[in-house]
Amino acid sequence: MDLALFFRNEVKPALGCTEPGAVAYAASIAARHCPGEPLSVALSLSLSMFKNGRDVGIPGTGGLRGNRLAAVLGVLAGDADKGLMALEHIDMAVVERAQTLLDAGMVTEEVVDGVPGVYAAVTLRCAGHEVTVTVAGRHDRVASIVVDGEVVGGEGMERAPEADGTLHGGASCEPSASFTKPPLPAYLEELRECDFAQLWDMAAGIDATLEQELLRGAAMNMAVARMGLESGWGLGVGHTLAAHAEAADLHARIRFMAGAAADVRMAGAPQPVMSSAGSGNHGITATVPVAVAAEGLGVSPRVQAEALALSHLVTGYLKAHTGRLTPICGCSVAAGAGAAAGIVKVLGGNAVQAERAVASLMASLMGMLCDGAKGSCGLKVATAAGEAYAAALLGMDDRGVQRPEGVVNPDIATTARALARLSREGFAAADAVMVELLGGGKH
């Protein structure tokens, strides 16, 4: 597998939550094709995009939240050339104007079925024109640009860009076109076919360039964690846990550092994090526990980099089975599993012990639901980080899950398939109910 390609696409900096970032990106493209004052903006979102963008802070807005605000900001001042960083340079004057338009009822938002988990269609109307820009499959993948009924750009619509080849829901929807089923990127197809020993060996074989990039990403996320400790952003999960922990307690430090980083990100701080599998919180969960363990135990930079590589590879492996956005909390079961494996590497363990740690982590957190990106994600990230360390200790003692336990199997491939099916079939109804509870009807 091309490791450089994997890390270039799956592990990269992100500013703010990726769901409203994708909405703002699409809206900024629409604005380019729709001259004049905006009259209305209509959002058609997948269930996952709706819940993950509904209540998360947007950087540069003073703590304001939501997909609808992101859309208006993208229309008014978004820079489409910056992709998911389209709102990087907005100022408070633009934010105030956007809030005025929101208060006037300019933006509507609805959840649609029959679309990929990553799906947002932004329809902008201005004097005499209507433009619809759709992102689908990945947060930065523009599937179509339609101006006054004519397709003028985009990579084409897909029926199932998710890793498992399925859709969320069954009905067709507007404004989407007919979908066709493409393959996963080749590097993810290859990753899906690996066994755990191969993941372990790939992590051990990273070159010097990847080593430095992985360490840079960990340093980026640790800086965000320290921000959370100092200032008590968001729910203050990390800040509060740290205030009541012994400084020498590595388990507690792993929990509060990871929680603090998620606090900062969910509150909308203008500070980038290194993401994993398309998610900043996945990136925090996959890196901060490993980095804290490496720092606390004094291992070499090379060992830390290999542990980080393993964490990202395990995270990517599991997400390649489940898809980008799922009803199950990916920070817990995917990135948390990656962190467990990475910590085993830091502790000096072997591949068998690391795979056992992955199984133990998943046995602990398999059923954790994703009810959207928001401040309380700091609690889930802190929990996943703490459980990752506990699972790693079990693995190092040759304990934990060693035979099938419920739906969890010591073999990562078997458990990944079970996780994908549970997420796709078992939790589909739960996802739909959550959207109703969150007010996901058109408004």
Curated annotation (Swiss-Prot):
InterPro entries of this UniProt entry?
Answer: Ser_deHydtase-like_asu, UPF0597
* GO molecular function per UniProt: L-cysteine desulfhydrase activity
One biological process term from GO is: L-cysteine catabolic process to pyruvate
Q: Which Pfam families match?
A: SDH_alpha
Q: Which domain of life is it from?
A: Bacteria
Q: Which family does it belong to?
A: Belongs to the UPF0597 family.
This chain belongs to which protein, by name? UPF0597 protein DVU_0440
